[in-house]
Amino acid sequence: MSFSMSRKQYADMFGPTVGDAIRLADSELFIEIEKDYTTYGDEVKFGGGKVIRDGMGQHPLATSDECVDLVLTNAIIVDYTGIYKADIGIKDGMIASIGKAGNPLLMDGVDMVIGAATEVIAAEGMIVTAGGIDAHIHFICPQQIETALASGVTTMIGGGTGPATGTNATTCTPGPWNIHRMLQAAEEFPINLGFLGKGNCSDEAPLKEQIEAGAVGLKLHEDWGSTAAAIDTCLKVADRYDVQVAIHTDTLNEGGFVEDTLKAIDGRVIHTYHTEGAGGGHAPDIIKAAGFPNILPSSTNPTRPYTINTLEEHLDMLMVCHHLDANIPEDIAFADSRIRKETIAAEDVLHDLGVFSMISSDSQAMGRVGEVIIRTWQTADKMKKQRGKLQEDNGVGDNFRVKRYIAKYTINPAIAHGIADYVGSVEVGKLADLVVWNPAFFGVKPELVLKGGMIAYSTMGDPNASIPTPQPVLYRPMFAAKGDAKYQTSITFVSKAAYEKGIHEQLGLKKKVKPVHGIRKLTKKDLILNDKTPKIDVDPQTYEVKVDGQLVTCEPAEIVPMAQRYFLF
């Protein structure tokens, strides 16, 4: 016997379905559900008088071997793979199934079994994304990790040793001793971590020992001297060990111009940090590197998006982070050469075109570790308002644009750093690093942050209250962040060379340790929905940016979404 419901009744009970559109926070971005893998009339839902009860939606005979450990019911999945509705089953901390959950004794088409061993997260009306990946971290203080987790970031890659002067300016963990200590420190945190060694050296031996000590890659930074010899040597070693090289190029053009750096790179794959140049790099035209097929370009979030306040705040940030002196004219000139409104404005558009592939933070070193996700969506919203719907978005929603932008902080940094087999998307076989969002707070404040299939961070009310919701509602660490649970739900990434030498056993690491791989044969074409390689030119006098001969610019935003409406401070 069939039963009819209005679309509103259905959405209230089981969440939106195919044909429904959902607004993302207070932005002008809308998503439209492309497919619904749950079965109408056989949906599972938890609660008093609901479906997931013994002998109904819950299999009465299934043991733990036959059912999932956790199911997220009726979730709206937003991922580079699509925007669709499904149940998500998690087993042993991994995404085991995406589709229809329930009891196959009563229901057709069940992909994952709910049993007595299954926990439930009711995701009706909620958006689920992969945990964010921030691939430009200065590990200046451990408190960054809590802030990142609370924003929906579950993987951090970068370098540093704490608030040392070198770390404040450069993302390097230099030398085996420092790398080993940071690998040991990583044990404390319910987050995936990987550390970059110092790549600025014109001899191979000091670089090799860092990779064999556990570095996932090497970082070249102008403050250590990004010379042609250092670049070439670093890339030779990286090719041998299959690790990534990240680079912050020579702002002052002391050792050469952008053309000289590209010549030294010589077609080899490299991750270029803050490729627009405001965060550093060849002035004024490092941005043209984004047009080459071996360059994997990223932005950092202080320039995301370009607003009326962007230029003003950058000078002071730069003076502090790069140990400059306001009393020295040369230092002021150095700072001024970086901060160019023309290239920052072009950066917005290049992201929207899919030319810039990734967004990261540059944490506490001219970047905000808790705002990667917010600023990504603020940029997407600004571009829709200024440039209109993308040609690929011919329906009600902005699905293509949303998939392009979410790839910038999930799958693409995972691909670039050789960890896409483990994290970076909502796909079967990957670590269940998932973020659950109320659509009204999407991109701003997650409801739940899962690490390896267990809740690590969550909004939580007064612990002494009779229910979970009374004020003050704060982000608090949950059980996945405690005790030995964090060892089973998070990964420390190392080089394949270090993994094969048993670095985890040598250092007594309890956390899961996995090797990075598949990096040196990458090209920009491997970066999903953000793989464009146009010809980019910069006028050396006016700093105007042209893409395939066309001027690319935009106006600064005066108002952005996901801002003061959501925060007191």
Curated annotation (Swiss-Prot):
Residues noted as binding Ni(2+) 1 in the record, renumbered to the chain: H136, H138, K219, D362
The protein's enzyme class: hydrolase
Cofactor (UniProt): Ni cation
Domain called Urease: residue spans: 131-569
Listed GO MF terms: nickel cation binding; urease activity
Cellular component GO terms held in the UniProt record: cytoplasm
Keyword Hydrolase: yes
Active site (record annotation): H322 (proton donor)
A Pfam short name: Amidohydro_1
Catalyses which reaction(s): urea + 2 H2O + H(+) = hydrogencarbonate + 2 NH4(+)
PTM annotation (N6-carboxylysine): residues: K219
UniProt: Ni(2+) 2 binding residues: K219, H248, H274
Cofactor: how and how many bound: Binds 2 nickel ions per subunit.
NCBIfam families: PRK13206.1 (NF009685), PRK13207.1 (NF009686), urease_alph (TIGR01792)
Similarity section: Belongs to the metallo-dependent hydrolases superfamily. Urease alpha subunit family.
Subunit structure: Heterotrimer of UreA (gamma), UreB (beta) and UreC (alpha) subunits. Three heterotrimers associate to form the active enzyme.
The protein's name in its UniProt record: Urease subunit alpha
Annotated source species: Bacillus sp. (strain TB-90)
Gene this protein is translated from: ureC
